[in-house]
């Protein structure tokens, strides 16, 4: 049921060229996407960090050239990626600032997923986490901050003032046992994400709503349906196009559901239907950029060969993991 993927990629043993590999895959299946490389120093120090920044810049320039050539559908965009700030020293933030400035793209970063990220910023830099990023001009209306569970009040105010986005990843937070974000109702631009825990956004909205209620939160399904559809605004800001409505001038990206509703399905109650009834099993077809990429519950490419390759790669990975032990 997804028409677009916003990706935060990491492959420390394969940095240069990795984003182009992802772009090839997105174009093959016809998905719209925005991707970046997760810049960090946690595996190989400043060298790894510099290589990550360079890959982000290289890929953004590749996208610019592809747009000018206009020989392929404009389905893939670039962000400038960074891992949690506790693995990006000030020298790295300066590199990221230059990358954002040089490419005109926004920052995609995971922040305050754990309390350590915040305390590290206070201990080593004497600043709130997002205030530190803002010092390097890294918080603006194209910025995507994932998680943000432990952002202090001043950082939330800064996020809202700069018109940036916070992406809430309920299932990932539960899986990693990092806690709960009790400040969702304070966020101006809230969207939902998976952080790689599946790709089912129907399911993600259900978990986001029910976990919120379990934590004593005040929001109802309509707030989470709004967060679900806010992904369209994220895409609009970065693609320079309009998404999310069946109107002239909007991109023809849509999901068609075959949902036999037991009660009236109306604009006023569709959020409740998504929370309590409708799911990805209801998806009949998906259109991206006016092209059917999933029709009558069938993909238009060979899934079997992709799955076979994935199983082979998974087995190889586990053999390498066993060798480490």
Predicted feature descriptions by range:
Residues 1, 26, 80, 110, ...:
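Divalent metal-coordination and catalytic microenvironments
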Residues 9, 14-152:
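Metal-coordinating catalytic core of metallo-dependent amide/deamination hydrolases
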Residues 30-32, 99-106, 138-141, 158-167, ...:
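Glycine-enriched alpha-helix->loop->beta-strand junction motifs that scaffold or abut catalytic
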Residues 39, 113, 170-175, 194-198:
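Short, acidic/turn-prone active-site loops that include or flank metal/cofactor-
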Residues 115-127, 155-160, 177-187, 197-216, ...:
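Histidine/acidic-residue-rich catalytic or RNA/ligand-binding cores of hydrolases
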Residues 135-138, 142, 182-261, 278:
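His/Asp/Glu-enriched, well-ordered alpha-helical/loop segment
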Residues 145-153, 167-179:
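C-terminal active-site-proximal or functional interface alpha/beta core segments in diverse enzymes
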Residues 228-325:
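Active-site microenvironment of metallo-dependent hydrolases
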